[in-house]
């Protein structure tokens, strides 16, 4: 099980503010983990006003530095960890340089797998039909009276299932 004190006062860069990383930021705030976050997103501030307002309100206890726009991620130096969203290319030079310099690369899904109370997890990958396939699996298991949750990029971030 994860020890949240390990994250105390760490400098963490959140790469991409999709639904998974947004849920991750709010989850860290709800746990009261005093981290120093920099949120990077290629979109301009005007496109993220609602998310910024929501996070600033709900995660007011966190130290957050917003780095928005295409040029915002020129360097990812000085962080303890990078939390990459699935849409952020793992082989971009900035991430590779950070990894080379000892920065830990992580993702919300890694943390979800670590915290999930069961190991009975079904993952669906691929480029076409993930939502349909995952929904069918969910419906079949639900009809068979299994306790089942459906989450991921189909609408509900995995962290929504934790308190």
Where are these regions (language model features)?
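N-terminal leader/targeting and accessory segments in enzymes
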Residues: 1-107
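Phosphate-binding loop of NTP-binding sites
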Residues: 29, 74-77, 86-163
């Amino acid at each position: 099980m994860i020890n949240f004190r390990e994250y105390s006062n760490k400098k963490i860069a959140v790469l991409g503010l999709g639904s998974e990383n947004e849920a991750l930021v709010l989850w860290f705030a709800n746990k009261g983990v005093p981290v120093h976050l920099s949120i990077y997103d290629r979109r301009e501030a005007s496109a993220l006003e609602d998310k910024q307002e929501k996070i600033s309100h709900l995660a007011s206890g966190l130290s957050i530095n917003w780095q928005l726009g295409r040029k915002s991620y020129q360097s990812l130096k000085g962080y303890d960890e990078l939390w990459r969203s699935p849409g952020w290319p793992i082989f971009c030079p900035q991430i590779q340089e950070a990894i080379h310099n000892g920065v830990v690369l992580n993702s919300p899904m890694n943390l979800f797998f670590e915290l999930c109370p069961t190991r009975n997890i079904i993952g669906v990958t691929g480029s076409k039909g993930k939502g349909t396939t995952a929904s069918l699996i969910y419906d079949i298991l639900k009809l068979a009276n299994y306790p089942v949750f459906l989450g991921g990029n189909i609408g509900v971030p995995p962290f929504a299932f934790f308190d």
